[in-house]
A protein has these predicted regions:
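Extended, subdomain-level signal for the structured scaffold at the beginning of enzyme domains
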Residues: 1-101, 189, 196-221
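A short, terminal or domain-edge coil/loop segment
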Residues: 87-97, 119-133, 149, 183-193
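Class I SAM-dependent methyltransferase SAM-binding "motif I" and its flanking Rossmann-like core
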Residues: 105-108, 113-179
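Conserved anion/nucleotide-ligand pocket segment
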Residues: 164-208
Length: 221
């Protein structure tokens, strides 16, 4: 299992993401293909969402990668095999931050949650992402409503919120902690306090830091 989980954007160690990709086959003419999942920002106006996706593309291309968006909304309420086929050609995924509850809903409703968990357990994909893209991997998402609006799921998709995470990690990830330049840093300090009070296992990341998983080796850099 290989994961590059950043607090904000690519963080301070994008070379480590490239290194994780070294074991996933060769690059094509445009670089190593990477699927970009941006459904955590499905609540934003279309033009704003497109600009945000574009900024992710620019950053990933600078690393020699070839990004393509896989919009999970295109696979809502369809057979999981369809999203599996869409993701099959990518040795890596990049899951953008935003609202973790929107992201969780999109992953579940498209069937991408089960597909990604299976790919990770078979070490068939490198999972990269930041903020909500890291948080969604926890066993449970309760507590994050202090920062992200859980009601956004019903407002955007007309469905109830899901509180379960993907369970890939055995602990929660709390980004932007001790990051005064990030507007949600104080809110996430409250999430940490809540987790400590409830005994919820968690790791904190400041902006710039990355949680790296490479097989059995887990480090924060």
């Amino acid at each position: 299992m290989r994961m590059y989980l950043s607090s904000f954007r690519l963080g301070e160690h994008p070379d480590r993401l490239v290194a994780l990709l070294g074991g996933v086959g060769g690059a094509g003419p445009g670089g190593v293909p990477i699927a970009v999942i941006a459904n955590a920002i499905d609540d934003r106006p279309a033009e704003v969402r497109a600009a945000c996706v574009g900024s992710e593309f620019v950053a990933l291309r600078e690393l020699g990668l070839h990004p393509t968006e896989v919009d999970l909304r295109m696979f809502f309420d369809r057979a999981p095999g369809e999203v599996a086929a869409a993701l099959a050609g990518f040795p890596a995924v990049w899951v953008r931050g935003g609202n973790v509850f929107l992201l969780r809903h999109a992953l579940a409703r498209s069937g991408a949650d089960g597909v990604l968990v299976d790919l990770l357990r078979r070490d068939a994909v490198v999972y990269g992402g930041y903020s909500a893209g890291a948080c969604v991997l926890a066993p449970d998402l309760r507590g994050l409503e202090r920062c992200d609006d859980a009601d956004a799921v019903s407002e955007v998709y007309g469905r109830p919120v899901r509180w379960d995470g993907l369970g890939v990690l055995d602990h929660a990830v709390v980004p932007h902690v001790g990051s005064p330049d990030h507007p949600e840093s104080a809110l996430l300090a409250g999430v940490v306090a809540d987790y400590r009070a409830r005994g919820v296992p968690h790791r904190t990341l400041r902006d710039g830091q990355v949680l790296l998983v490479d097989g059995e080796r887990v480090t924060v850099v």
